[in-house]
Amino acid sequence: MSVASVALSPALEELVNFPGIIGRFGFNLDDPILVFLTIAGSVIPKRVMESDSIASVKLRIQSIKGFFVKKQKLLYDGREVSRNDSQIRDYGLADGKLLHLVIRLSDLQAISVRTVDGKEFELVVERSRNVGYVKQQIASKEKELGIPRDHELTLDGEELDDQRLITDLCQNGDNVIHLLISKSAKVRAKPVGKDFEVFIEDVNHKHNVDGRRGKNISSEAKPKEFFVEPFIVNPEIKLPILLKELISSTLEGLEKGNGPIRSSDGSGGAYFMQDPSGHKYVSVFKPIDEEPMAVNNPHGQPVSVDGEGLKKGTQVGEGAIREVAAYILDYPMTGPRTFPHDQTGFAGVPPTTMVKCLHKDFNHPNGYSFSPENTKIGSLQMFVSNVGSCEDMGYRVFPVDQVHKISVLDIRLANADRHAGNILVSRDGKDGQMVLTPIDHGYCFPNKFEDCTFEWLYWPQAKEPYSSETLEYIKSLDPEKDIELLRFHGWEIPPSCTRVLRISTMLLKKGSAKGLTPFTIGSIMCRETLKEESVIEQIIHDAEAIVPTETTEDEFISTVSAIMDNRLDQYAWN
């Protein structure tokens, strides 16, 4: 998956403000907003009107240089501009303001490969893959070329390192990358007494090189250059076998030389961790210091000024623990998991845990060395094989029960970032049934409801009533036990976030008990427009207006409950 980071550097901001630059690009001072996009190394000015909708701006970006844009994120003033039906002015954009954007381009890249003897063939690979993967594909396609590690790939005369990402090679705007493959020189040693003689062989001829006295350095143990290990706050916690195996398989891949592959999708640093063969992904690692608007974010986003994340009510650097918390609270029908059990949760959140990890291929803007200060702490989530995400296909084919299980999770956790792109689609191996897997839960558990968004709200499945099994699961939920469970795992969830969790769970339980559909319950939680408060926000404000400031949390929640009952009765009668 490829992302073009569209962010303004300080140098570019000076360029925009430099006298005469406006006229040079053919714009007048009367133009309300100028947006400068950097895509594939080019700076492209675009005019944006205050009355333009967010959707129209995204459509305009799609036409730039013929790029096929699958997904875009627009950022302004540290906040994601996410509501397509809102206007530019709704987000406070005015004359002279600058937008930061992240867009996702087509996942696939065409590669033309030519051998030294003139043979040519083509490959199509994901942009998130690296050069080493391309070598493996070449070897499987052209058997006579031999072992992948014995070859060199060059681009414009430059030898490419195996860990180089394909997306990094797409800098000249060409639709096809042209590579040259040749056999690399082989080095072998022949013992001669206490010395050894070194031979270097290439495709056409051999050379003798003077040897040196000493041991063969290849037999010496290499110094440790990486590690992956659990990050556990509470020593009473014992990792289940599934999570231990997840960490172990991730480490085995690194030991075989298969380094992390940074995903070019999304606005934070996320790394695909490979298995020992290098052919499959086993996990996804998200360091806290590379989250959106964090200090080491690899996409060049501005650092958060007040600590708030892209979504209102979230904090930069807390995305990883929220990812883990979503897995912990997504327990099965039988209730919270107990050691050593590791059953799949009701909504199917992939197994996730906190780890410490060190590797040179993570983002180290100040340079890398094998030292404690370069250790990354973040979430490690099991990779789920899939055939795409929900944004890649029509939503009418999704099973009702699969959509409903995700709605339960999102309403309960007050998810501020549920879109079709973070719901994976796969097929059950037994009967081929479609399975939806929710991922990316770094914006759950906010301290306010302002940015709650559920894309499934507009799918027809959301207007179907919950099944008896789902209602039974919802009935069993207990926010107080959930809060204690999170604390046991080391997250001292802030009081403002626990309040939201209590109220969101209350809404889910009360609404479903009255026969309300996911659509109705979700509509109560989400805003219809950017500036119009949701029903749940109105209920909270009504409660705040009634109770005195020194009221206990239990008394406040009781007041919210009474007001909510009255509101929900109106929905039930309709």
Swiss-Prot record:
Protein species of origin: Arabidopsis thaliana (Mouse-ear cress)
| Top-level taxon in the UniProt lineage | Eukaryota
Q: What is its EC number?
A: 2.7.1.67
Keywords carried by this UniProt record: ATP-binding, Kinase, Nucleotide-binding, Repeat, Transferase
This protein's record includes keyword Kinase: yes
Q: Which family does it belong to?
A: Belongs to the PI3/PI4-kinase family. Type II PI4K subfamily.
Q: Which residues form the Ubiquitin-like domain?
A: 32-109, 110-188
> Which Pfam family, just one, is annotated for this protein?
ubiquitin
* Molecular function per GO: 1-phosphatidylinositol 4-kinase activity; ATP binding; kinase activity; phosphatidylinositol binding
Q: What biological process terms from GO does the record include?
A: regulation of flower development; response to abscisic acid; response to salt
Record protein name field? Phosphatidylinositol 4-kinase gamma 3
Q: What class of enzyme is it?
A: transferase
Sites where the protein binds ATP? S264, D265, G266, S267, G268, G269, A270, K286, Q381, M382, F383, V384, D440
- Write out the ranges of the annotated region (G-loop): 263-269
This protein's GO cellular component annotations are: nucleus; peroxisome
